[in-house]
Amino acid sequence: MEYGIVVYAGEHNRFMCPVTITLPYKSKYKDFRGAIILSKEGEQLAQVERDKGTIHITFLIEEMKRGEKKEFRLKFLEDVSEENGMKLERYNEQIGVLHKGNGLARYNFSRELSKPYIYPLIGPTGVCITDDGPKDHVHHRSLWVAHGDVNGVDVWAEKDDSGRIVHDKFLKLTAGPIYAEIVTKNVWVDNKGRPLLDEIRRIRFWRPTNIGWYLDHEVSLKATYGDIILGDTKEAGMISVRVRKSLTVEEGGRIINSFGGVNEEETWGKRAHWCDYYGTLEGKVVGIAIFDSQENPRHPTYWHVRDYGLMTANIFGLTYFRRGAGMRGDFEILKGREVRFSYRIFIHRGSTIDAKVGERYIDFVYPPKVEVKA
């Protein structure tokens, strides 16, 4: 079975850009385990996933110029080799993410931890780019989620009276030629173990390319047990990163945001669509950028980003970021309601300019348009 696909670059250059096609699920698809995308340039595997009456086909657009149109053929397959794809492997209380047998990241979920987090996070040169529990801030856990005032409970720090984020169960673990995905349920609790709210975390690790790789990170918070106030504090982030010491501004690295702000002086407490942190690691320039989704509350986010290595998307700390403006950043979730925060993390080679971080953000918020023809 084959379909024709037409992809339109639109007003932007595209490079290693994820594209997903959604079709109504039909019984004739039940024996298909994968798909292949054919074009004049060659062929590539696509990832197929079924979900609630639909079927999703995902692949990567290698390169398209502004205004370009490309035609592809989609062919479903009954069998797909997993040799060169993404894989998930369990190591006690960690889920390892691998590509072609090489580790990219590990999701740490032990219930003894203060919070689940991702560490290590391997950069495009094969070296970890994040720090886990540095001495100056032991609660900074590589790539993590936390908030310092949840109905008055500190779920940011790691002290005796701090709250915690506790792993409950995995809802989904899947891997294929294009991405691996972890979906997990966590419960935020106070220091007595009493539940504050429920969290669904969805993390998609995209196949590495020659420019680096993407990680899509989505957090949904539900006020299951009562009304929730996420208080006004700078010690919070629905996505936070702590880079390795050698990447920090203090060691010669740089922070750049979407408005051209440079380093902490021009980016801390400022709003921006994205923020990038890069520097030299073992003789090679690498970086990590966070892209804020346009669908997120209070987009574009404020940034709690420091020359010593912290980068956090924080929409809450307005009394700190907007001193004297009479503004507060408290965020209320009424009982039974849910709020979602989505980000793309771009782990890249080179500087902000070298990696064309701004163009890759456009791929995230304004992806190419796709037509499917039977």
Regions found by a protein language model. Name each.
Residues 227, 233-302:
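Active-site/ligand-binding surface loops and adjacent short beta/alpha elements
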Residues 5-7, 97-101, 215-223:
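Short, well-ordered beta-strand segments enriched in hydrophobic/aromatic residues
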Residues 1-85, 107-185:
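Alpha-mannosidase-like glycoside hydrolase catalytic domains involved in N-glycan trimming
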Residues 83-108:
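An acidic-aromatic substrate-binding cleft motif
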Residues 50-64, 291-374:
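Beta-strand-rich recognition/accessory modules
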Residues 69-78, 184-186, 201, 217, ...:
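Short, hydrophobic/aromatic-enriched beta-strand segments in well-ordered soluble domains
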Residues 127, 137-160, 264, 274-331:
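Surface-exposed beta-strand/loop segments enriched in Pro/Gly
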Residues 88-89, 184-233:
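Acidic, contiguous internal or C-terminal segments within carbohydrate-active enzymes
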